[in-house]
C-alpha cells in the first residue's frame, strides 16, 4: 500500500512569527528604497543646479543675472542670444562649423591611427614590441604642457599656425595613447584562433585586421568616437594656442572672445552662447550613451 511522503504541516507556533515579520520587513525595505531614491534625486538636483542656473540666466536680462539669483526668472528675454550671435564680425554658426570640422577630423584620425597601432602592439610579433608599448603608456602620464612648446615651434616653422592642421594632424599620428591602450586591451580579448584560421586561408596581416579584428572592435571604436568628440569639442588650451584669427575660431575660443568683448555686462550673453554650445554635446551623448556604457563594459576599462 502506498504511503504519503508529504512533509507534515508546520506548527502554528512556527509560522506566526514569520507571518508577523513579513510586513515589517517589507515596510523596512520600502522605507530604505524611498530614502535612497530621495537621496539620489537631491544629489542629481545638486549636480544639475549649475546647468539649470545657466539655462535660466540665458533668458534673463543681463542686469538681472547676478543681482537676481533665483531659479524662477521674473523677466524673460531673447536679447542675450541676439547680442551674442555675432563675435568678431562672424556669426556663431561659423564657430560651430569650425568645431565640427576639428571634432570629426579628430575622430577619423584617432579611429584610423589608434586602431592600427593597437593591432600592431597586440597581434604582430616584432622586436622590442613590449618596449614600444611601454613608451606608449608613459606618454599617457606626460602632461600636454610639456610638449606644447616644441609642437608649437615645429608647426610655426612650417607656417601652419592659425590653421586646423596642428589640431588634426597629431590625431592621425596616434598621439592619444589612452585610446591605444583601450584598443590593445580589447584586441587581446579576441581569440587568436580567428587570426590563425584567416592566415591558413591566405590572409595577410592587413586582411586579418580589416576583415576580422576591425569588425569585432566596434565597442572600442564607439567608445573612442564618443570620448574624442567630447574632448575635442571642449578643448580650449590647444585651440587657444594655435588659433588667432576670428575666422578659424572654434566654439570655446569664441566664448572666450565673447567674455573679453562683453566683460562689462555680457554675463547673460555668455550664458546664452554657452547654452547653445552644449546642445551638440547633449544630443550626441543622448544618442550614444547606450553604446558608451556597452563599450566601457566590454573593453579594458571593465
Can you say where each PLM-predicted feature lies in the sequence?
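Short, Lys/Arg-rich, polar N-terminal cytosolic tail immediately upstream
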Residues: 2-29
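A structural signal for multi-pass alpha-helical bundles of membrane permease subunits
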Residues: 32-302
Amino acid at each position: 500500500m502506498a504511503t504519503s511522503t508529504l512533509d507534515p504541516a508546520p506548527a502554528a507556533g512556527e509560522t506566526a512569527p514569520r507571518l508577523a515579520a513579513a510586513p515589517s520587513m517589507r515596510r523596512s525595505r520600502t522605507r530604505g528604497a524611498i530614502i535612497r531614491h530621495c537621496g539620489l534625486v537631491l544629489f542629481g538636483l545638486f549636480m544639475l543646479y549649475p546647468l539649470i542656473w545657466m539655462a535660466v540666466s540665458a533668458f534673463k536680462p543681463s542686469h538681472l543675472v547676478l543681482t537676481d539669483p533665483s531659479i524662477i526668472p521674473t523677466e524673460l528675454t531673447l536679447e542675450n542670444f541676439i547680442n551674442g550671435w555675432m563675435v568678431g564680425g562672424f556669426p556663431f554658426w561659423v564657430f560651430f562649423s569650425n568645431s565640427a570640422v576639428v571634432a570629426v577630423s579628430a575622430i577619423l584620425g584617432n579611429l584610423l591611427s589608434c586602431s592600427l597601432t593597437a593591432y600592431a602592439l597586440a597581434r604582430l610579433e616584432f622586436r622590442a614590441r613590449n618596449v614600444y608599448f611601454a613608451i606608449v603608456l608613459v606618454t599617457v602620464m606626460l602632461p600636454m604642457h610639456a610638449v606644447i612648446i616644441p609642437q608649437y615651434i615645429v608647426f610655426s616653422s612650417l607656417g601652419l599656425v592659425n590653421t586646423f592642421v596642428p589640431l588634426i594632424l597629431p590625431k592621425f599620428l596616434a598621439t592619444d595613447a589612452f585610446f591605444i591602450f583601450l584598443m590593445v586591451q580589447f584586441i587581446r580579448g579576441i581569440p587568436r584562433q580567428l587570426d590563425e584560421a584567416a592566415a591558413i586561408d591566405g590572409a595577410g596581416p592587413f586582411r586579418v585586421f580589416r576583415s576580422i579584428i576591425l569588425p569585432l572592435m566596434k565597442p572600442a571604436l564607439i567608445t573612442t568616437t564618443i570620448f574624442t568628440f567630447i574632448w575635442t569639442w571642449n578643448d580650449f588650451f590647444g585651440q587657444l594656442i594655435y588659433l588667432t584669427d576670428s575666422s578659424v575660431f572654434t566654439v570655446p575660443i569664441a566664448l572666450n572672445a565673447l567674455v573679453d568683448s562683453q566683460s562689462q555686462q555680457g554675463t547673460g550673453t555668455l550664458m546664452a552662447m554657452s547654452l547653445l554650445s552644449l546642445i551638440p554635446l547633449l544630443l550626441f551623448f543622448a544618442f550614444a550613451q547606450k553604446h558608451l556604457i556597452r563599450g566601457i563594459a566590454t573593453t579594458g576599462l571593465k
